[in-house]
Amino acid sequence: YEDKVVIVWFWELGTKGTSRVLCVEVPSGKVLWENDAARKYKKYGDDKLVQFYVHYWEDGNDDRDLYAELDVHTGEVYTRRYPGYNANVFATTIYKDYLFYGAEKGDAYVGAIDLRTHEMLDEVMIDFTRGDFNQIASIGVHDGQLYVEIQTELDHSDIHVLDLDEDE
């Protein structure tokens, strides 16, 4: 950001401490706010950081699974759960007003959350040839197309390209 830097840090696994987020004014170095809402955020717009993470559980998702939105001016965090949603979501990207994510639920899916309303849109299944690995490794947007990398083997990935409807 022009006048501030947001720093997210995580303690090393196995050590004692609390992961933190802090906002530092530039160039003074003054700490504007600090909290313990450390997540792997992505920048959205001029004043927000967002994250969507879900880990599949046989009994349904747990308390850590949610959408989180951090206001960079205040440090306040808005969270939202999607009751009944159960998948593995590790890869996300932001494009315009949408957070796109890759979801693993036995098959591979791509979904989106409208960042203005927080509505979860319908997911689309991706047809791919299975291997021994089968995980969504990355997701990104370029020139109006959504690219999804599915790692099917330890040393091989398939790239799937979906056209985005810019009017919807």
Regions found by a protein language model. Give the residues of each.
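Blade-level signature of beta-propeller repeat domains, shared across WD40, Kelch, NHL, RCC1
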Residues: 132-168
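Small side chains
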Residues: 29, 68, 75, 91-92, ...
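Aromatic (tryptophan-biased) beta-strands that constitute blades/sheets of beta-rich domains
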Residues: 30-35, 76-83, 119-130, 165-168
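Structural motif
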Residues: 14-22, 58-68, 106-112, 154-163
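Inter-blade boundary loops/turns of WD-repeat beta-propellers
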Residues: 26, 72, 115, 164-166
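A structural detector for beta-sheet-dominated domains
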Residues: 9-10, 36, 53, 73, ...
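Short beta-strand elements that form the blades of beta-propeller/WD-repeat-like
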Residues: 4-15, 47-61, 94-104, 142-152
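Repeated scaffold domains used in trafficking and secretory/extracellular systems
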Residues: 1-2, 34-48, 52-54, 82-96, ...
